[in-house]
Amino acid sequence: MKRNAAIYARVSSDRQREQNTIASQTALLLEYATTRDCVVPQDWIFQDDGYSGSVLARPGLERLRDLVAEGFIETLFVYAPDRLSRKYAYQVLLLEEFSRCGAETVFLKSAGGDNPEERLLVQFQGMIA
């Protein structure tokens, strides 16, 4: 049975916007989600275009958090930890919040986080983002 999944993508700079990286992040994540036997409804693709990763007040992220809290999302795909947040404390907060609500967070460009060593690597990447 296919798992319900969502995608979160973010860019903050004009250069990133010009390079169309939010679309490329989304396309890569959609492709990856299909390999993990997940279905991503179109309205479960959350994007924050032009928002800094150093703040939590982002419209796409807020809608995503609401949906995760309602228990609908089983898997969340994000390109890399720094796309979720540029602050380590916020990354930990969000990852724990999603996990507590039953959503697995999968980063395309990072260690999987399935064991203590991989979780430590994700945390380390968050500290230097």
Language-model features: locations:
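Short, structured surface patches at the beginning of a domain
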Residues: M1-A129
